[in-house]
Amino acid sequence: QDNYYPIGKSLKNMNENDIIIVYENTLIVVEVKAGSFTPDPAITNYQSHLRSYESLFQKGSMQCQRTIEYLKGNEEAIIYSQDKKIKKIFNMQNYTNIYLMCVTIDFLDVFAAKAEKISGINIELGTIVLSVDDLRVYQDFFESPFIFLNYLKNRSAATKVEQLKLNDELDHLGMYVFNNMY
């Protein structure tokens, strides 16, 4: 079930969020994106590819950012169900770790792993973009939620390193396994 929060103070117009995960003092805001990716080769139709990336990566990042702004902008941020019943009340002072995650259903690992570095796409630094398939790998790999949260901390920080352009999400995992704080 999606989450909803008001635009302004009225419940007449609501923004939507896919998933909010709470674990201890950590908050993970997730947007899940799917869509038809252009079948045209990038070499012949670059603009079509750029629009596909914008639709999958940039919009998800913007939705995550908008959700965080709402949560941080209200002392008691209320999240509603679609029928406008209160689902949860958030007090952001309870969270010391906040991660934004855009999950794509489409298999775009080569681009998702470095989405924040694609020219022409505006993704909030710190936002982790990955495929649902990579999440399944993480589910099998990480034995402890605390190790996974430490990985998210490092993975989020990696988005801010301009020189780091890995070609696959599992390259990020490999860097973490072999170098820990990469």
Which residue ranges define each predicted feature?
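Intrinsically disordered, low-complexity Ser/Thr/Pro/Gly-rich regulatory segments
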Residues: 1-182
